[in-house]
């Protein structure tokens, strides 16, 4: 049996421990070699075959000295496995503290003393005792569990190991104290495959205890006499030494096992006299244990008897439930009386012989620890005993019984496994053994109890403390993560104490507080039970006899205190110094009292172990391995009727519960069990948690409780490594969410629900902080339910939604939770609740209902549909968006989130700060975003969610394509939705787990936001809703909120998707959507209702809040999507608010920061995708506002264009677009507070978040972000523009907004923008596009396009009418139709997408558009590449520069189209800026000016594209001025617009030109190497102009390259000027490429000479000369720019040089530089 194996291993391990001890202390593997060799030879044979040892070489290295332990050599594989699994870190966590001193002392004098005492004890004990003493010595000194570790080492080789042992002995000695070694021992033992999985570990402690105790009776009496001195001595030395010295007999075989498994030391401590556990656990515990051993020398036998009795009782229990019962009953009978030990001793009848004792204990071991036996955890009969104990111990005891069942099972497992993961398993085992510990205490309250309960639990708990234990789990997670640290139990015990104390001091105190709270809240009954039971003065802890096993609450505070105390030398010395008798007994009792907490902590290790067990495959095996484990299960079932079925879970769960015991043992058992068990249990334990959260609300609970919960989640999730690491991450990093994410959808939902709860928590706002934390922790822990509930409970929300809806929802319908809990909680949140409230009045009822009704809404999807159709759905969306944001915000700025403004602030602060924090804090973001991402990603998680999902959408797989094929949109969204709610969530959870990285989180966040925004904007909901449309079944999850949401949201989505899809239905849908979108907007923006209700004012504010929040939350997790979406929406929302846009700017600023990063990225992608399909992009990008904007611009722009072109049809088509374009307008108008607000709301509905943000600002946002314009900067710029023009000309404003879209729509779809501008009213879209700045520019462009719409629209948009309709479109009604139409066209154009053709059918000018689409496609193909990059480049421009940058970006984005647009934008911008809204008025006029500038601008833009890359505000401004100057030439402007048709010929000529192609390449390179960004302008101007002047090159870097170029190199520049601007552009592009100093090595004179010769040749051959001049300019510039490291860009110049056939030296230089650059 595993018991036999363990016994064998223990016997073998016993020699090994001795050897280890000797080898460790004396270096001699000789003492252990003879004994160890026989076992080592066989075991290593088996173990060498095990690859586990190699798996953990770090451990093995320390184990090197121990290889003589053949038997344990086998154990190390499992131990190593467990070590790898990661539960051990927690087991190690506790032990390291006790071991920390122990290894040191032992290393110094303790080693010898320990050896001596161990050997002496061993001598007393004969071989088995000797082996245990050796082990004890290893334990006492090594209790580091290096003995097992040596077998680990030995695993590598048996004979070789001996040799290695000789080599590694010394290291082993060192390693004795080394974490790896102790770790290895613990882990080794834990990974005692059979021990951990089977009763081996279990029995090992018990038998060892018996063995130890049999010898301990004889030897413990002797040895106790010795040990009292030795123990005190060793106590002062080290807990390990004390353990070794204190309880050689007790430690005996157990010591072997303890040595084998330092983690088991706790269990060992259980079985071993208190001295063992105490010494093992730390000074205090050791003192107590030593007190038990040394002070109660006479009690030592009793302790021996008692441990023997429990052990044997366990054995008997395993063997006979009656004996078990008797023993168990005896234990209860004598909670603290030693006499009970004697009665228990007969059942235990510890084998007289050490081997029998060892065998029996091992046999017992399979069952559980003696304490476990005490728990009666094995026998059904025992449960009554435990139940009496439970009754005695009070309410907490039943939970403990519950815990004990699991705990005992876990204790059996835990002892089996806990030996390795001494801390966690011990904790768990002791948690299980806590009642037995009581019983043992009852059995005499002798050392056995202390070793088991006090020593193990209190020591374990103390080493880790309630909070500390979490910390220790964390630390040891790290230890586990970093085997070096966990290598040695003893060493890390020493090392661990500092890490552990980090948590211990603070967390132990906090844990003490939290535990005190938990004791008050959870352990109240326990305290009641305990106080009467305690025999010792320390009643709270003393209740150990009555409550010890069941006194997690009491034990917790005291344990924390005890932990702090045992950890603190003061306590330890006092215990050591104090009389070994009463003080030690008292301490022992205290520790016994603490012991339950240790047991609770132990379950954590069990949970961790279980998490590791899955890794090792023993989690189930743990329970399964032995009948005794099953009896444990049986007992668990019996004592824990509630959780009888949860036994397995309970083992894990109880481990978690006990681990979370700091929270509430009574709760935690439920929490533990229910979490694995399911919603019911979850609700129950959540209720418990709700009762207990306040105590653990503190950081201790957060750290420990959260960690514990994390442990629960890993336990539940069987995350194993990750789970524990997650726990650690959560407590330390707060990243635990991920772990539990993958654990189970419910857990995910718990997380989500936690978010929902967090939202709800946000409702209680004040609690949000806690909710956030707890939510993060719990969510992270995957105990969103308990977490949330607890959190809700903690948070005065009482979160009925959480408790009722949330818990039920979480249990019942995660989706509902998500949808409702979230919306409910959202509703609960004043902000969204109010918005939703007054949005629907259901929201009002929902607000009152918020929690209740939301839950009901959650429950009542119909209600959600009816009331929360949008309300719930809105709430859901808001919950998603807003709640997500709020939740994210809650996570970040919980308290702020608590307030609407707090939410706003949260959004803002969160967005700017916390968004980045979240971005930075992947954990939180991961928690929130992952949760959200899990949720939204789940929805979006076709691939990774928004990433895949967005790209699906944004790639045209989403948005337009999805939109274009709304079916496909639905399909995709259905996919998304189907995916999203359930599949996707789970997938996403997995993805999040797998892809929880910030990237994925960003993706998920982005996608989440995008999804949310899309859903909110219709994208997410759209997919969700289409999914709902496709099947409302999915709406269940998504449709939960989508269900009701789905209809309206679908409607809205439809409207939006149709708007996106631009199908006429969208008109109806738009109307619907306007209805819906009011709430949809609220929903989407989390502001629709509010926005709708208070569209201009309230909504704007609320929208601002929500938008900001959504935006920021979006940033937070939507990042790009939300950033764009909400960002834009925020701006508009804020714009709606008037000055709000600035906060959005703020928000955007923060959001832009990372959105800049992310958004930039997405923007480029977005922009490309968005260009591809505005609808699609919009749909896609609904969440991805940036390019949704772009889209929005395309859509909005185009929508406006289309709206202009085909007001009606496009409106139908563009309803959503128009809507959200209108929305943009409406937003902008919303800002004005026009009826457009309704439309805005509808637009928001459509694009709820999208219109708001997407309308223009999202694009601007993204664009700005992309450009780094400081989105806030130029988004406010945009906002201001939008705001000013918005107020003045709401269409223009939306255009402004659209300009943001157009802006990077310019980048992205500058053509679209251009088309948009042209199509749009110049001002409206111009403003919007030009971001007002170049939105005006664009407005001019729009005017330009508007003026030349026939031309442009003919050429580009081919739509004069629509363009003219732009004015009406400005009105927003007609515009959107045109816009919609146009957007497709623009999108077509912008992306070169065939949307134009789609639009074609819709728009009469679509063919023109198509041409532009092609041209623009080419143009945009280049421009977006360039543009997207340039926009990214522009990202750095300031707001004012942003306008210029926008111009530049437009130019850069459109490269060619951008020049047109930028020329137009410059002129238009000036005009529009001057006119503000003169877009419509100046349409015709600006068009022409735009045209004129456009060609000029075009060359510039190429140049400027580089400049844009340079992102020089002056350059941009110069470009703008230049463009403005050039704005007078209408024809060129038209070509730019015509650029698609006519200019494209020119532009494409160059593009087609080799140089142009090269330029494109160079541009790409330039974009890639933006390092040259600032250089690019210099190259452009300097390239042509600065050829002659090096200094001038730098100066001209930011000057117009065109004019200076001409003046600088008259011939070549003139030629260049004379050359088609396309050529110049080509040059510019080439220059762009050349802007890198082509010839850094070339001297200015040489370059000039070459240049002159080239110029001459250029005069002869202008083309060559121009190229040469470009090269020369690059070369000359290289002179100047050479220093900045522009040499790298030389790669680009070489090609032009080659192409221009520059002189040999130049090519040589170029080639050399090329090579250099390439090499670089």
Curated annotation (Swiss-Prot):
Coiled-coil annotated residue ranges, if any: none
PTM entry text: ADP-ribosylated by TNKS1.
Main subcellular localisation: nucleus
Spans annotated as Tankyrase-binding: 1440-1532
Gene Ontology cellular component annotations, sorted alphabetically: adherens junction; CCR4-NOT complex; cytoskeleton; cytosol; heterochromatin; nucleus
Keyword Repressor included in the entry's annotation: no
InterPro entries in UniProt: Tankyrase-bd_C, TNKS1BP1-like
Sequence positions bearing Phosphothreonine: 131, 238, 503, 533, 1275, 1554
Record's compositionally biased regions (Basic residues): 1568-1577
Keywords for the protein's UniProt record, in alphabetical order: ADP-ribosylation, Chromosome, Cytoplasm, Cytoskeleton, Methylation, Nucleus, Phosphoprotein
Compositionally biased spans, kind Basic and acidic residues: 117-127, 232-243, 840-866, 991-1014, 1027-1039, 1208-1230, 1593-1606, 1656-1670
Molecular function GO labels: ankyrin repeat binding; enzyme binding; protein serine/threonine kinase activator activity; protein-containing complex binding
Pfam families (alphabetical): Tankyrase_bdg_C
Chain span(s) of sequence motif Nuclear localization signal: 1620-1626, 1714-1719
Protein name: 182 kDa tankyrase-1-binding protein
Originating organism: Mus musculus
């Amino acid at each position: 049996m595993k018991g036999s194996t363990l016994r064998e291993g223990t016997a073998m391990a016993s020699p090994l421990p001795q050897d280890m001890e000797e080898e460790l202390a004396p270096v001699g593997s000789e003492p252990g070699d003879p004994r160890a060799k026989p076992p080592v030879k066989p075991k290593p044979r088996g173990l060498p075959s095990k690859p586990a040892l190699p798996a953990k070489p770090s451990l093995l290295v320390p184990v090197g000295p121990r290889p003589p332990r053949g038997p344990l050599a086998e154990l190390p594989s499992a131990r190593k496995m467990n070590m790898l699994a990661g539960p051990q870190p927690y087991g190690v966590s506790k032990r390291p503290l006790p071991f920390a001193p122990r290894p040191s002392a032992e290393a110094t004098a303790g080693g010898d003393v320990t050896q001596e005492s161990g050997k002496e004890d061993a001598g007393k004990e004969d071989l088995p005792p000797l082996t245990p003493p050796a082990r004890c010595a290893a334990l006492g000194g090594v209790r580091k569990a290096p003995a097992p570790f040596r077998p680990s080492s030995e695993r590598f080789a048996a004979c070789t190991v001996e040799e290695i042992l000789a080599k590694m002995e010394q290291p082993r000695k060192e390693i004795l104290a080394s974490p790896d070694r102790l770790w290895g021992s613990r882990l080794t033992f834990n990974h005692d495959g059979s021990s951990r999985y089977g009763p081996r570990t279990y029995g090992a402690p018990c038998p060892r205890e018996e063995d130890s105790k049999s010898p301990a009776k004889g030897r413990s009496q002797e040895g106790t006499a010795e040990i009292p001195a030795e123990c005190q001595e060793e106590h002062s030395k080290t807990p390990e030494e004390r353990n070794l010295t204190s309880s050689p007999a007790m430690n005996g075989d157990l010591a072997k096992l303890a040595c084998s498994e330092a983690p088991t030391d706790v269990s060992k401590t259980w079985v071993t006299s208190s001295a063992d556990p105490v010494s093992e656990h730390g000074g205090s515990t050791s003192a107590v244990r030593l007190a038990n051993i040394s002070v109660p020398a006479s009690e030592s036998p009793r302790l021996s008897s008692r441990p023997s009795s429990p052990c044997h009782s366990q054995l008997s229990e395993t063997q006979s439930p009656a004996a078990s019962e008797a023993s168990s009953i005896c234990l209860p009978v004598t909670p603290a009386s030693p006499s009970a030990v004697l009665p228990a001793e007969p059942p235990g009848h510890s084998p007289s012989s050490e081997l029998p004792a060892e065998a029996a204990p091992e046999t017992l071991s399979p069952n559980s620890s003696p304490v476990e036996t005490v728990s009666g955890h094995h026998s059904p009969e025992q449960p009554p005993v435990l139940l009496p104990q439970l009754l005695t111990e009070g309410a907490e005891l039943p939970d403990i019984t519950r815990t004990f069942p699991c705990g005992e099972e876990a204790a059996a497992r835990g002892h089996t496994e806990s030996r390795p993961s001494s801390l966690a398993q011990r904790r768990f085992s002791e948690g299980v053994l806590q009642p037995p510990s009581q019983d043992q205490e009852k059995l005499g309250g002798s050392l056995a109890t202390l070793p088991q309960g006090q020593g193990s639990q209190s020591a374990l708990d103390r080493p880790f403390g309630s909070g500390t234990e979490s910390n220790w789990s964390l630390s040891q997670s790290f230890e586990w993560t970093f085997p070096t640290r966990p290598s040695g139990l003893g060493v890390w015990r020493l090392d661990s104490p500092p890490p552990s104390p980090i948590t211990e001091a603070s967390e132990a105190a906090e844990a003490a507080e939290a535990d005190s709270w938990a004791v008050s809240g959870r352990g109240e009954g326990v305290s009641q039970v305990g106080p009467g039971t305690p025999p010792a003065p320390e009643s709270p802890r003393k209740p150990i006899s009555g409550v010890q096993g069941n006194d997690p609450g009491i034990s917790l505070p005291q344990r924390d205190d005890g932990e702090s105390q045992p950890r603190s030398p003061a306590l330890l010395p006092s215990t050591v110094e104090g009389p070994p008798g009463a003080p030690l007994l008292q301490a022992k009792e205290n520790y016994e009292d603490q012991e339950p907490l240790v047991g609770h902590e132990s379950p954590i290790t069990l949970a961790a172990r279980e998490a590791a067990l899955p890794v090792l495959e023993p989690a189930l095996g743990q329970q399964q391995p032995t009948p005794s484990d099953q009896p444990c299960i049986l007992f668990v079932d019996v004592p824990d009727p509630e959780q009888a079925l949860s036994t397995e879970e309970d083992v894990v769960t109880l481990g978690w519960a006990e681990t979370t015991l700091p929270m509430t043992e009574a709760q935690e058992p439920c929490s533990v069990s229910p979490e694995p068990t399911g919603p019911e249990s979850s609700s129950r334990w959540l209720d418990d948690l709700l009762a207990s959260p306040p105590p653990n609300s503190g950081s201790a609970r957060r750290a420990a409780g959260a960690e514990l919960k994390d442990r629960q989640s890993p336990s539940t999730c069987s995350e194993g490594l990750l789970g524990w690491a997650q726990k650690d991450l959560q407590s330390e990093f707060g990243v635990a969410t991920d772990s539990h994410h993958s654990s189970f959808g419910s857990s995910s939902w718990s997380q989500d629900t936690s978010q929902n709860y967090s939202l709800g928590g946000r409702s209680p706002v004040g609690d949000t902080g806690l909710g956030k934390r707890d939510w993060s922790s719990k969510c992270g822990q995957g105990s969103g339910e308990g977490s949330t509930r607890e959190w809700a409970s903690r948070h005065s929300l009482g979160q009925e939604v959480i408790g009722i809806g949330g818990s039920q929802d979480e249990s019942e319908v995660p989706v509902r939770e998500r949808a409702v809990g979230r919306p409910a909680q959202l509703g609960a949140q004043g902000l969204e609740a109010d918005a939703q409230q007054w949005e629907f009045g259901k929201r009002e009822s929902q607000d009152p209902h918020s929690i209740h009704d939301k839950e009901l809404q959650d429950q009542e999807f119909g209600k959600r549909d009816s009331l929360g159709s949008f309300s719930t759905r809105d709430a859901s969306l808001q919950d998603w968006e807003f709640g997500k944001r709020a939740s994210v915000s809650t996570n970040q700025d919980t308290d702020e989130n608590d307030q609407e403004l707090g939410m706003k602030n949260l959004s803002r602060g969160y967005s700017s700060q916390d968004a980045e924090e979240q971005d930075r804090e992947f954990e939180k973001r991961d928690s929130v975003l992952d949760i959200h991402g899990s949720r939204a990603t789940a929805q979006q998680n076709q691939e990774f969610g928004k990433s895949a999902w967005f790209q699906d959408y944004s790639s045209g797989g989403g948005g337009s394509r999805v939109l274009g094929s709304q079916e496909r949109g639905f399909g995709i969204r259905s996919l998304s939705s189907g995916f999203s709610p359930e599949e996707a969530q789970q997938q996403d959870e997995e993805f999040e787990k797998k892809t929880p990285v910030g990237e994925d989180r960003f993706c998920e966040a982005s996608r989440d936001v995008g999804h949310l925004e899309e859903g909110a904007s219709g994208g997410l909901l759209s997919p969700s809703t289409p999914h709902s449309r496709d099947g409302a079944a999915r709406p269940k999850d998504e449709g939960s909120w989508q269900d009701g949401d789905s209809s309206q949201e679908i409607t809205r989505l439809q409207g939006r998707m149709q708007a996106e899809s631009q199908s006429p239905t969208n008109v109806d849908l738009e109307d619907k959507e306007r209805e819906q979108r009011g709430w949809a907007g609220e929903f989407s923006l989390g502001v629709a209702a509010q926005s709708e209700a208070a569209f201009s004012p309230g909504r704007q504010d609320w929208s601002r809040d929500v938008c900001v929040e959504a935006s920021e939350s979006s940033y937070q997790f939507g990042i790009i999507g939300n950033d764009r979406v909400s960002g834009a929406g925020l701006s508009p929302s804020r714009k709606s608010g008037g000055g709000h846009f600035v906060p959005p700017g703020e928000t955007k600023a923060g959001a832009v920061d990372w959105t800049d990063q992310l958004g930039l990225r997405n923007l480029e992608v977005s922009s490309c995708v968005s260009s591809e399909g505005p609808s699609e992009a919009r749909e896609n990008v609904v969440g991805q506002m940036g390019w949704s904007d772009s889209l929005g611009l395309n859509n909005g722009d185009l929508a406006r264009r289309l709206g202009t072109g085909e007001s009606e049809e496009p409106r139908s088509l563009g309803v959503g677009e128009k809507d959200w374009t209108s929305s943009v307008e409406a937003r902008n108008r919303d800002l004005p507070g026009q009826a457009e607000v309704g439309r805005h709301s509808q637009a928001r509905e459509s694009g709820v978040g999208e219109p708001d943000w997407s309308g223009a600002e999202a694009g601007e946002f993204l664009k700005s972000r992309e450009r780094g314009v400081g989105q806030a900067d130029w988004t406010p710029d945009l906002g201001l523009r939008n705001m000013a023009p918005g107020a003045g000309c709401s269409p223009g404003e939306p255009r402004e907004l659209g300009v943001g879209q157009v802006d990077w729509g310019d980048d992205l779809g500058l053509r679209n923008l251009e088309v948009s501008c042209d199509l749009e009213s110049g001002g409206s879209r111009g403003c919007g596009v030009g971001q007002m700045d170049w939105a005006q520019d664009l407005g001019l462009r729009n005017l330009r396009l508007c003026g030349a719409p026939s031309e442009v629209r003919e050429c580009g948009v081919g739509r004069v009418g629509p363009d003219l309709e732009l004015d009406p479109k400005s009105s927003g009604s007609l515009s959107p139709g045109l816009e919609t139409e146009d957007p497709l066209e623009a999108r077509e154009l912008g992306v070169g997408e065939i949307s134009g053709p789609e639009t074609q059918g819709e728009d009469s000018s679509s063919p023109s558009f198509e041409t532009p689409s092609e041209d623009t496609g080419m143009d945009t193909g280049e421009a977006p590449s360039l543009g997207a990059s340039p926009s990214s480049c522009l990202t750095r421009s300031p707001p004012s520069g942003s306008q210029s940058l926008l111009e530049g970006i437009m130019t850069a984005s459109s490269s060619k189209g951008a020049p047109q647009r930028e020329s137009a934008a410059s002129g238009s911008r000036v005009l529009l800026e001057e006119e503000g809204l003169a877009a419509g008025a100046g349409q015709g006029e600006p068009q022409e000016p735009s045209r004129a500038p456009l060609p000029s601008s075009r060359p510039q833009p190429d140049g400027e594209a580089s400049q844009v890359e340079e992102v020089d505000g002056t350059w941009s401004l110069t470009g703008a001025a230049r463009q403005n100057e050039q704005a007078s030439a209408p024809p060129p402007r038209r070509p730019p617009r015509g650029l698609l048709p006519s200019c494209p010929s020119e532009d494409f000529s160059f593009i087609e030109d080799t140089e142009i192609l090269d330029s494109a390449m160079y541009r790409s390179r330039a974009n890639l190497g933006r390092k040259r960004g600032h250089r690019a302008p210099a190259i452009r101007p300097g390239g042509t102009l600065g050829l002659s002047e090096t200094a001038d090159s730098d100066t001209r870097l930011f000057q117009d390259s065109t004019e200076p170029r001409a003046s600088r190199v008259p011939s070549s520049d003139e030629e260049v000027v004379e050359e088609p601007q396309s050529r110049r552009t080509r040059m510019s592009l080439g220059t762009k490429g050349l802007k890198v100093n082509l010839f850094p090595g070339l001297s200015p004179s040489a370059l000039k000479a070459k240049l002159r010769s080239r110029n001459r040749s250029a005069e002869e051959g202008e083309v060559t000369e121009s190229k040469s001049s470009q090269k020369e300019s690059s070369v000359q510039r290289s002179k100047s720019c050479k220093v900045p490291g522009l040499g790298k860009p030389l790669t680009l110049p070489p090609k032009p040089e080659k192409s221009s056939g520059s002189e040999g030296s130049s090519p040589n230089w170029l080639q050399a530089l090329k090579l250099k650059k390439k090499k670089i």
